[in-house]
Amino acid sequence: MKNKFIIFLSIFYLFFLNLYANTTPPFKNISVHEKPIQYNKIVFEDFDNQQIDLKNYNNEIYILNFWATWCAPCKKEMPSLDKLQQNKNIEIFAINLETKNEKKTKKFFKDLKIKNLSIFYDPDLKLVKLFNIRGVPTSVILNKDRKEIARIIGDIDFSNTDFINWLLNTTGNKQ
């Protein structure tokens, strides 16, 4: 009887240890919201001045990455963000906050060998105001209902296995 109790406690402990490990952000610059934040309209533009509205997408996870070509940390994290875009459950929108300059922006992507990401703009800085963006890089993580569940201020390695596992577990648990 005593052995069964010890086995039960061990399993119970391992279960909650695993649960905690999967919900704790792997990087200190990730801020997880206790309650998801709802936004009414998330709209930005592509190179062709076409409006992109998130309500027209159907994914499990959205990442809005706010960046600039002059930003060294943005340059550092962009290849890992490009790699993460290969995940079919994640839709990443790399939103350049500079004045629209197609030549400069495409060169930035070409120099970094970015192949999976598309480039978007926030020409009137409406999203900057909506999301209260204070600097770059900043990444806003939204769940399938397009509610903000977490925010990353500064650069991270988006291809880090611990981050990917945390991201998939967190977005699956937040409603």
Predicted regions and their residues:
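Positively charged n-region of N-terminal signal peptides that target proteins for export
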Residues: 1-5
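Short active-site neighborhood of thiol/selenol oxidoreductases, capturing the structured segment around
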Residues: 53-75
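Structural microenvironment flanking redox-active thiols in thiol-disulfide oxidoreductases
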Residues: 75-112, 123-130
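Thiol/disulfide oxidoreductase modules built on the thioredoxin-like
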Residues: 110-115, 122-167
